[in-house]
């Protein structure tokens, strides 16, 4: 056949981004995303591949910014009539089902929690698989929901953090599961969540850890002066004595959409923090405003003002620790890497 280059009409404005291009199920329809320079407007277009003509399908605006990277989930279903996308337009990242012309069929998920990632769509069974923070912002669990928005079911009831790899036919999934004191356990499960086989239990590491006196990582939340609830953790020495006064080292990252306070295996950094705890230093961490898993307003509160609210919240954290009867308030330090170094 002959190849012909066809320019697509993306509008007359030149100061913009065209960050994503997708084929729909129709070989003659190309989808592309257009964003303005400020990234507070996201437009989805469908273009005719033969003529280059394009049509605006959906336009989403925000007072702050539209987070394309976090909502990079546009998927055209094989029925050729509909597509699925995610959006934070109602304040939390949720899943939406649209007709090809952009009209909304339904919002599939809703609530004061986030869909952290889409895992798969079983079109034959009309089921959609996703991971969310519904149980807690400190956890990640795997769910299935019908495309009619009904029958939502939790597939991974174990508390902690689940990362999922699902087979292309949606009959099986591999679950990478961990908590703050349990290293990653990998299991093969059927689509109902039933465990079929343990692929890795990290038994050797667990046995090795049993030989060390490790302090427990405790999660907590506290209100700041303006009433914002912040999540944190504290690691006390294994031989903790509540009558002693301990120094505290705060660990911070705190960048937009990030998260340090999470019920998952912490790896080598946690072991370093355990080493400090063994030396008699309490290690503590607070996820300030601007961090993730708490919804759009919490994450975007630092927009165009990086460093201000984050610093206030870390100071609030330090004051919170200073009030603890076993803390020496004259010996509170802080360290951070990258954005945490900037903090």
Q: Which residue stretches match the model-derived regions?
A:
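Multi-bladed beta-propeller domains
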Residues: 1-18, 47-72, 99-122, 132-135, ...
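Coil-to-beta-strand transition motifs
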Residues: 3, 39, 92, 181, ...
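Short, flexible loop/turn elements at secondary-structure junctions
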Residues: 12, 25, 34-36, 51, ...
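Structural signature of eukaryotic scaffold interfaces centered on beta-propeller domains
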Residues: 22-25, 70-79, 120-124, 166-167
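Beta-strand C-termini and the immediately following turn/loop, strongest in propeller blades
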Residues: 31-38, 45-48, 74-90, 108-109, ...
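Serine-hydrolase catalytic core recognition
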Residues: 33, 161-343
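A short loop-to-beta-strand structural motif that recurs across blades of beta-propeller domains
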Residues: 43-45, 94-96, 141-143, 185-187
